[in-house]
């Protein structure tokens, strides 16, 4: 596994169906998309950075890349359902309900991003990009089964305040 990939993401990937379809939302440089492809998942990586997407496609031609403005454009996945959705270090609240709708029958959502309190460590500091306490939990609680949830201060890979969640449509999830 790549040392740059999130340990939280690595921990819960086994819950996604082997060879399943996975969306890496706001994928950035593709650290998780590349890992997913390496593990045999069918990956779609979406981001607004064309250069990063081109680099991902060059490194792993099997990854479907999509250039999209997730905050200013329309949601490109209305007709799609994924076995897994991975989101790290990204928050645009209007997408949260759309992510839940984009999960397949037994889909798994693995989410990790910054929360209130992170401003003391640097960026992001804008409240629009910081989850409130228990916010991810509150969003999914009535629609998914929560496998794991954490929030608080971390020191690795750098000091930050984060919120992490893994949830699934399965009512009887197996633990990794």
Where are these regions (language model features)?
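A short acidic, Gly/Pro-enriched loop at the edge of an enzyme's catalytic core
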Residues: 75-84
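Conserved beta-strand signature within the Rossmann-like core of class I S-adenosyl-L-methionine
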Residues: 106-115
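Conserved SAM-binding strand-loop segment of SAM-dependent methyltransferases
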Residues: 61-73
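Conserved SAM/SAH-binding beta-strand->alpha-helix loop
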Residues: 49-51
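Core SAM-dependent methyltransferase catalytic element
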Residues: 154-176
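Conserved SAM-binding loop
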Residues: 56-57
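Conserved alpha-helix/loop element of class I SAM-dependent methyltransferases that forms part
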Residues: 2-19
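Conserved class I S-adenosyl-L-methionine
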Residues: 20-28
């Amino acid at each position: 596994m790549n040392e740059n990939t999130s340990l939280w993401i690595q921990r819960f990937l086994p819950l996604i169906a082997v060879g399943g379809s996975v969306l890496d939302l706001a994928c950035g440089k593709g650290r998780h998309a590349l890992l997913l492809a390496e593990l045999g998942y069918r990956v779609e990586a979406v981001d607004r950075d064309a250069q990063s997407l081109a680099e991902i496609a060059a490194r792993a031609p099997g990854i479907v890349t999509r250039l999209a403005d997730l905050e200013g454009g329309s949601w490109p996945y209305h007709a799609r359902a994924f076995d897994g959705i991975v989101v790290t270090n990204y928050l645009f609240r209007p997408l949260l309900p759309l992510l839940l709708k984009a999960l397949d029958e037994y889909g798994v959502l693995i989410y990790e991003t910054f929360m209130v309190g992170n401003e003391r460590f640097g960026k992001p500091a804008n409240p629009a990009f910081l989850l409130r306490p228990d916010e991810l939990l509150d969003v999914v609680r009535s629609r998914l089964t929560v496998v794991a949830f954490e929030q608080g201060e971390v020191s690795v890979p750098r000091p930050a305040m984060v919120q992490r969640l893994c949830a699934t449509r399965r009512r009887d999830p197996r633990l990794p």
